[in-house]
Amino acid sequence: TLARRFSGGGAVYHDRGNINLSFIETVKQPDFVYYLQQVVDFLEKAGISAYADQRLGIYVDERKISGSAQCIHKDRVMYHCTLLFSTDLDTLNAALNGDPDAESRLPGSRTMRAVPSVRSEVANIKEFLSEPMDIKRFMHLLFHSFVDDDDNRIYRFSAGDMEAIER
């Protein structure tokens, strides 16, 4: 799936090898670099030497492994990013580069005009891991790295929350 986020940023390609991560918080003064740095720090703990650019993308060896977008609504801030773990990069590139043969790889796709994305060479995180790992294990480690941080907490939706979401 190829989508554009309402929160900005470039086009986003989704498949089962792509991890989506969001931070939502109530703050007076958002610090998007703080959220970005948490992801970079996790990757460092996983043995991946990653770095961020001024557009809040994350790179390894000059290849992009994560893009992000941010938005503010009233006193709520949302930072979200994609992590390319084991994405089909051929299909991703065909979709994002407007390959005329993308329709055969992406049934139901269609062309549309939008603000162009900033192009970057991409890579999968799994290429940089010192030991093989599947996406479920990686997500487990990622989740626990945030949960174990005292600054972060889990919010569990109540039945009332779920009803409001469904409306």
What residue spans do the PLM features occupy?
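N-terminal lobe of the biotin/lipoate ligase/transferase fold
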Residues: 1-30
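A structural signal for short, well-ordered beta-strand segments
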Residues: 21, 56, 81-83
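Long, positively charged amphipathic alpha-helical accessory segments at protein N-termini or as interdomain linkers
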Residues: 37-49, 66-68, 73-167
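A short glycine-rich, hydrophobically flanked beta-strand micro-motif that places a catalytic Asp/Glu
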Residues: 49-59
